[in-house]
Amino acid sequence: MQTSQFHWHYFEIQPAKGGRFGEFVDRFQDRPTVPFVVFNASGKKVVIPPGLYTWYQFSNEYISDPSTVISGSARYRTGGFYDGDYKSIEFTGAFRAGNRILGSTGWTHQIIDLRYGNFHNDLIPMKLSYSFTTLASIQALVQYNNQTAQVSSNIRLALLNRSGTGLFVVYNDRRDTYSADPQQVLGRSFIIKYTRLVDF
């Protein structure tokens, strides 16, 4: 598979009080050499055949001042997707409590219409982070994807030094919500990583 992407942010307004509004366009090109599945859920499968595909997507987005207690963003995207049509809307809301607690949640809804089939996808992420100090923090992400009918979670503890290296402790979990057992665990991992910068 050979892919390329071009991004052009041709219009943007940045108010003095923070945030921004803008428009941009993305150009995609893909040359799959074998058929691949782009959607497979609820007994429905959509397959992209081999070939050369080029398409464009145009986006409008608004992002409010992220330094305020409550902030948000909205994005609308429309254009092509391989040899079909694509539309999506995305909303995100965030809050902060002092300098330590940050949280956000969002919703992305995609509508894709191809010659080989139509489908939609919903993605719902929720994030929460707490900073003990400027170098120590814990972050949690829980995300639902209706295409795969899965809930994934990620929890990361970071204890860093001033060079940005240090100790990372990460827990990952994936669960299936579509099977007969709605809490079937598809995978778990527990990772401990330590990095240190060495001068020679």
Question: How would you describe each model-predicted region?
Answer:
Residues 1-200:
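Exposed, low-structure sequence patches enriched in small/polar residues
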